Amino acid sequence: MTEGVPSAGSALPTPAMSSLPLAALNVRVRRRLSLFLNVRAPVAADWTVLAEAMDFEYLEIQQLEKYADPTSRLLDDWQRRPGASVGRLLELLAKLGREDVLMELGPSIEEDCQKYILKQQQEASEKPLQVDSIDSSIPRINDMAGITIRDDPLGQKPEYFDAFICYCPSDIEFVHEMIRQLEQTNYRLKLCVSDRDVLPGTCVWSIASELIEKRCRRMVVVVSDXYLQSKECDFQTKFALSLSPGAHQKRLIPIKYKPMKKEFPSILRFITVCDYTNPCTQNWFWTRLAKALSMP
């Protein structure tokens, strides 16, 4: 057995194991954790109790409830916070009385930890020697830390959004209307609007990729004639589509808010459009859009 890894089914980790990041746990273990913790039971601590023990706030837990697999999302969010580790997770499960989880998943967790330690040792042996004081290629802080108004500058608590808004500057008035209808009403959605939320000084392509892939659950595309001429909008749209081929995850939502002289973009034709130009359905427009953005 690898030194520092607890024996199968043990309730508490050894001190050495406390330093292993949560990334050591693979998908199989995480899915089985979800099977145990997603179930809401009055006699056993579920994922919401674990989230409180991880110091998640009430509103953060409410946001997690939107997801089909809240335990998986909880682990993803927690592993970005300081102090998150395999050892700490096992300590919390033991403290909450979930010995059943520890006994059932102990062997699998031990196996994952062994593989992780072995991989780290192999990478360390293959890595060329670098002198930290003269190697300018070693980043001190995540390049994508502090890219939005409410971001943590150190990257420990990044800002998340319900939707990234892809739009042209000429369509900004409609974006303002979206903010009024979706953020400042009972829907209380959180939109990522570049001109309002993104700090200047970083590559626009890198920021867009980070926000669309990792910070926003959906992307709304405001389609217009000017949109078709925008290289930035074209990049954002194609990047979002690449994350969800065939729109299986309903990640991208096109909006047509005014008549167009040019053809609707072919890459978006297979996705259901929210059409603000249709007077027969305009009364339902914001409700449908808000519901689509609120889906887990």
From Swiss-Prot:
Residues carrying Phosphoserine: S244
TIR domain mapped to chain residues: 159-293
InterPro entries: DEATH-like_dom_sf (IPR011029), Death_dom (IPR000488), MyD88_Death (IPR034249), Myelin_different_resp_MyD88 (IPR017281), TIR_dom (IPR000157), Toll_tir_struct_dom_sf (IPR035897)
Domain comment (free text): The intermediate domain (ID) is required for the phosphorylation and activation of IRAK.
Gene: MYD88
Protein task: Adapter protein involved in the Toll-like receptor and IL-1 receptor signaling pathway in the innate immune response. Acts via IRAK1, IRAK2, IRF7 and TRAF6, leading to NF-kappa-B activation, cytokine secretion and the inflammatory response. Increases IL-8 transcription. Involved in IL-18-mediated signaling pathway. Activates IRF1 resulting in its rapid migration into the nucleus to mediate an efficient induction of IFN-beta, NOS2/INOS, and IL12A genes.
One annotated GO molecular function: TIR domain binding
Intermediate domain: annotated segments: 110-155
Family annotation (Pfam families): Death, TIR_2
Protein name from the UniProt record: Myeloid differentiation primary response protein MyD88
Sorted UniProt keywords: Cytoplasm, Immunity, Inflammatory response, Innate immunity, Nucleus, Phosphoprotein, Ubl conjugation
Keyword Electron transport listed: no
Posttranslational modification: Ubiquitinated; undergoes 'Lys-63'-linked polyubiquitination. OTUD4 specifically hydrolyzes 'Lys-63'-linked polyubiquitinated MYD88. Deubiquitinated by USP3 that cleaves 'Lys-63'-linked ubiquitin chains leading to inhibition of MYD88-induced NF-kappa-B signaling.
Complex formation: Homodimer. Also forms heterodimers with TIRAP. Binds to TLR2, TLR4, IRAK1, IRAK2 and IRAK4 via their respective TIR domains. Interacts with IL18R1. Interacts with BMX, IL1RL1, IKBKE and IRF7. Interacts with LRRFIP1 and LRRFIP2; this interaction positively regulates Toll-like receptor (TLR) signaling in response to agonist. Interacts with FLII. LRRFIP1 and LRRFIP2 compete with FLII for MYD88-binding. Interacts with IRF1. Upon IL1B treatment, forms a complex with PELI1, IRAK1, IRAK4 and TRAF6; this complex recruits MAP3K7/TAK1, TAB1 and TAB2 to mediate NF-kappa-B activation.
Subcellular location, record wording: Cytoplasm; Nucleus
Tissue-by-tissue expression: Detecetd in mesenteric lymph node, prescapular lymph node, lymphocytes, lung, kidney, skin and urinary bladder.
Domain Death, first and last residues per copy: 32-109
Protein origin, superkingdom: Eukaryota
Main location class: cytoplasm
GO biological process terms, semicolon-separated: defense response to Gram-positive bacterium; defense response to virus; inflammatory response; innate immune response; MyD88-dependent toll-like receptor signaling pathway; positive regulation of canonical NF-kappaB signal transduction; positive regulation of interleukin-1 beta production; positive regulation of NLRP3 inflammasome complex assembly
